[in-house]
Regions:
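Donor nucleotide-activated moiety binding/catalytic core segment of transferases
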Residues: 72-80, 84, 131-132, 136-164
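A short beta-strand/loop micro-motif in the catalytic core of glycosyltransferases
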Residues: 51-57, 162
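Aromatic- and Gly/Pro-rich donor/ligand-binding loops
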Residues: 1-45
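Catalytic donor nucleotide-activated moiety binding site of glycosyltransferases and closely related
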Residues: 24-32, 60-64, 104-105, 110-147, ...
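A donor-sugar binding/catalytic signature common to diverse glycosyltransferases
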Residues: 154-195
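Leloir-type glycosyltransferase catalytic cores
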Residues: 142, 196-243
Length: 243
């Protein structure tokens, strides 16, 4: 929410409407490793009023330190604070057969090509969540403007997920899916997805249209999420309770 690419300087994201004594961030994301020079002074001004900083990726800790001289903590994205069992309660799916799911934050021909290649290898159909004007490709079934329940269901019931989206990565992890993630994009590198997977010990990066299907130890991954959830909730309780 602190990415200059996404929000510019909408005051709401920096809590300028609130008293400084009430300003805390939780899992805020800059989405980039460094700020362009033209944003630095404005970010310093906006952030210095916060009491505590929580960010989504380690690079955010570094940015907060550079901008404010203070320390930030890295915590889980809110989607990961909710268990898979809870998400399953709202999940709805109209697809009754195994499939490969594509979900992209922006159009990516490389992901489509990778998914189609995977489709041939696994003999599975490909479905793509398509809210934006993505290029239409033959051999792909499109899911247009799903409801929240249908969106969650798309990930819950997929056999494989191919994505370049942070939340596509997050929901794949929540449901322990066989995932393939492209970090590189037109805007640079998706440090949010990269940071999440590295913190969980998952190596599934698509590079030049290829990705090794390395084994994922989901027991270890789920243990790490459980431990990080406890730390994240303790942080939230520290100021919600007046700490």
């Amino acid at each position: 929410m602190w990415s200059p690419r996404c929000v510019g300087f909408d005051p709401a994201y920096f809590l300028t409407f609130a008293d400084d004594r009430q300003k805390y961030s939780y899992a805020a994301s800059f989405a980039i490793p460094t700020l362009p020079d033209e944003f630095i002074d404005e970010y310093k001004k906006r952030l210095n009023g916060f009491q505590k900083f929580s960010v989504r990726e380690p690079s955010g800790e570094k940015l907060v330190k550079e901008l404010t001289g203070r320390t930030a903590e890295t915590h889980l994205d809110p989607t990961l604070l909710i268990s898979a069992d809870e998400w399953k309660k709202i999940a709805v799916s109209k697809i009754d057969k195994p499939y490969i799911l594509i979900f992209t934050a922006n159009p990516a021909v490389s992901l489509v090509d990778f998914a189609l290649k995977l489709s041939k290898e696994k003999n599975l159909p490909v479905y793509c969540i398509n809210d934006a004007p993505h290029p239409v490709s033959h051999g792909i079934n499109y899911i247009v403007a799903p409801t929240v329940e249908e969106f969650v269901g798309c990930f819950k019931n997929a056999e494989y997920v191919v994505t370049n989206s942070f939340h596509g990565t997050a929901f794949s992890v929540i449901f322990n899916k066989n995932l393939f993630v492209e970090f590189k994009n037109k805007s640079g590198r998706n440090i949010r997805s990269e940071g999440l997977l590295k913190s969980l010990g998952i190596d599934r990066e698509i590079v030049d249209g290829n990705c090794r299907e390395t084994e994922i130890n989901w027991y270890d991954v789920n243990e790490k999420i459980t431990n990080q959830t406890i730390i994240s909730l303790d942080y939230l309780k520290s100021f919600v309770s007046g700490g």
